[in-house]
Design a protein with these regions (language model features):
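Catalytic cores of alpha/beta
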Residues: 10-16, 152-153, 214-229
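Alpha-helix C-terminal capping segments
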Residues: 15, 30-37, 93-103, 227-230
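Glycine-rich beta-alpha loop elements in corrinoid/cobalamin-binding modules
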Residues: 1-46, 247
Length: 415
């Protein structure tokens, strides 16, 4: 059985590999178990058994909502078009009790804030209960930028024990964020939002996207120079390259304009590999993408920024919150893949950071001998072939995804 966005975007293609193509949420696995093993093996209600996950440490995780009420063009949630769905206060409380006593709780939502004010306040109240009862010391969540339009929202979560908030800044260039339908980021200046959050005593975390397809290397370097030269704001938690994920408006825009590089495979869509034609020469862009993985050329300035940021914010943030913000410096100066599981196997060769030329990693080498009929399962799925054309094996799924997206996103051009 398989699920997730790739399966939802390519259901017909994936059916050739999977016994069960799951297009819904994780609870659909109950139906798989009922069909494959019998109804006696499937629970009537979905209650995760955190007690069986002995490896969970001091940080627990819960889910207080699903999906998002915004439609950023590069986001898989936009491609799937599901409405924002918060859970009830009772359900969130039940999850917290199941997780048990932890030091911190991470709320694994796409958007903790959402568009339901009543639900938001109820869920914050539940998190306050957990802190006050000693179930955990603090918590973190992801919110969209509209959360910061009213200071009372920030004060509400801070007083409820919120340690840190992650928000998708993506770029300080509001023209770029607006181009990707992320208009909520243009309502207030981002530096002002970040400063207000920090001064309220809540760590602000964010990520950056460097779009080499629409911005020059010089332009992106100027933005990075601004960040490392501004001690008022923390460093980003990550810096990634935009991905043309099938099913999203951004994907169809790139597909229709012929900008996805020939030979691009699904395994290349990893946020560290260039898969869309760049403004600068591709060789220069690839070298820049490689240097970004360890922030080559910025490490000394990152160290200075960390010292200055700590000095500027130690009166606002506790040692734990300050440490959370400063941890980003270590994340940026280490290759992105070092944060992934270590047992996935190493790539068989030097990385190129260009789609279609990246060496394959251990996922494509079976650990033991398998029958030849499974050979295709260990080959990367081609998105765009060597001629620059869409892979015919997935063409029907891609067309169906466009048809489903058009009613929701009229800006997506028809085939």
């Amino acid at each position: 059985a398989g699920g997730g966005h790739v399966v939802r975007a390519l259901p017909s293609y994936c059916a050739s590999f999977l016994d069960y193509v799951c297009l819904g949420d994780v609870e659909e696995l109950g139906e798989v178990v009922r069909d494959a093993f019998g109804p006696q093996y499937a629970a009537e209600e979905h209650h995760p058994r955190f007690d069986l996950a002995h490896y969970i440490g001091r940080v627990g995780h819960v889910e207080s909502s699903r999906y998002c009420n915004f439609s950023c063009s590069f986001c898989t949630l936009t491609g799937e078009g599901r409405p924002y769905l918060p859970v009830s206060a009772d359900e969130l409380r039940r999850q917290l009790q199941a997780v048990g006593r932890k030091t911190y709780i991470g709320i694994n939502d796409n958007n903790f804030f959402g568009n339901n004010r009543k639900s938001f306040k109820e869920r914050v109240a539940v998190m306050r209960e957990g802190v006050e009862s000693g179930l955990f010391r603090g918590w973190t969540a992801l919110v969209t930028n509209d959360f910061f339009l009213k200071r009372e929202n920030l004060e509400l979560v801070r007083d409820a024990g919120c340690t840190g908030l992650f928000s998708g800044v993506e770029s300080f260039d509001t023209a770029w964020t607006s181009r990707h339908n992320k208009h909520q980021n243009a309502v207030r200046p981002q530096v002002e939002v970040i400063r207000e959050c920090l001064e309220a005593g809540v760590t602000f975390l964010y990520g950056m996207m460097v779009d080499l397809a629409t911005r020059t290397i010089a332009d992106i370097r100027a933005e990075l120079d601004f960040i490392v030269g501004c001690p008022e704001i923390p460093l980003p938690s990550y810096i990634s390259i935009p991905i043309p994920i099938p099913g999203t408006p951004f994907f169809y825009e790139c597909l229709d304009s012929g900008r996805i590089l020939p030979g691009t495979r699904f395994r290349d869509l990893d946020a560290t590999t260039i898969s869309v034609a760049t403004l600068d020469p591709l060789a220069e862009a690839a070298e820049f993408a490689r240097d970004l993985q360890s922030m080559r050329g910025y490490r000394a300035r990152i160290a200075r920024h960390s010292v200055r940021f700590a000095a500027a914010n130690r009166r606002h943030l506790s040692p734990v919150k300050l440490g959370l913000a400063l941890y980003n410096a270590a994340l940026l100066c280490e290759p992105l893949l070092t944060t992934l599981p270590k047992n996935t196997g190493q790539a068989a060769g030097r990385r190129t950071h260009v789609s279609g030329t990246e060496p394959l990693d251990g996922f494509y080498r079976p650990k033991f001998r398998v029958d030849s009929r499974f050979e295709k399962a260990f080959q990367p799925t081609v998105l765009i072939d060597a001629r620059g054309c869409l892979n015919e094996e997935i063409a029907d799924d891609i067309a169906a995804g466009r048809d489903a997206l058009l009613p929701r996103r009229g800006a997506v051009a028809a085939v």
